[in-house]
């Protein structure tokens, strides 16, 4: 199944359930939001996204605890969960998806 088909399935499922979606992105720098919104019907369920490339932005906009980053690293499930929860709260959505990672030698 193609990425586009998977996104269409998600859009249809959330729309049928009257649910909404937001994103919190780091390493993908808005790429996930772009993929979602490139599919027809996304506006029915997609509310918005936050690109939080720097740790301070993850903390300020998404509520990620700096302790979580220092304890687990920025590339961790714990940070991704806090990012997703922060986006869900910021946009008042049912669901949120988060991506995290590092592009260089220094996290």
Report the location of each language-model feature.
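Short alpha-helical segments enriched in small residues
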Residues: 1-107
């Amino acid at each position: 199944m193609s990425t586009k088909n998977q996104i269409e399935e998600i859009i249809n499922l959330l729309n049928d359930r009257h649910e909404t979606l937001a994103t919190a992105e780091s390493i993908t720098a808005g790429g996930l939001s772009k993929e979602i919104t490139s599919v027809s019907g996304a506006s029915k369920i997609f509310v918005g996204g936050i690109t939080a490339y720097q740790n301070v932005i993850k903390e300020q906009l998404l509520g990620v605890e700096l302790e979580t980053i220092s304890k687990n690293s920025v590339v961790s499930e714990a940070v991704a969960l806090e990012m997703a929860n922060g986006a869900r709260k910021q946009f008042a959505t049912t669901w949120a998806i988060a991506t995290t990672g590092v592009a260089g030698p220094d996290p």
